[in-house]
Amino acid sequence: TILNSDAYQRTSAKNSKNEDDKYYYSHAYIKPLSAEQFFYSMLEATGFERLQKRRDKNQLESMKRNYLRRFIYLLDNGEMEEIEAFNGTVPQALMMINGPLVNDSGDHRQRGSLINYILKNYRTTKDRMKRIYLTVLSRKPTSKEMTHFERYMKRSLYNDKKLAYEDLYWVLLNSAEFALNH
């Protein structure tokens, strides 16, 4: 019942009637994910459990705890801010650019990686793109995004077009849309 309520279904898109509303909850407010929300979103978007499927459940949970501990350590800004006030840091940006969670899941050659899985199981550019968007942003790409990516694929200098899917995945993971609750 709650999921079907008008309040729960609010969008962050403003219209002419609620553009200046700050008090009456006429639209959802955009806010950064907490550090833990961001971490668990990363685990889902990267397919972490699929990459680690050879491990038993206890090992997997232990790895998650260790990653979470390191993740929160990286996000600590040293000013005793609450972890709920997470707005991103330089170490977080570096982790998103070069970290093993992002790099391992985005490598199309690595068996079990998200991109490898998508390229194996989906044949068309459209289907592959939809799956990447649904996995990372929990939505389908717009027609404008589809057109833009198809144009990117055609103009890409890559000999191996699979690398363009890695780029798309990396860009979506590093987008504001991924890091914000909207």
Labelled PLM ranges:
Residues L3-T142, L172-H182:
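An acidic, gly/pro-interrupted, aromatic-rich
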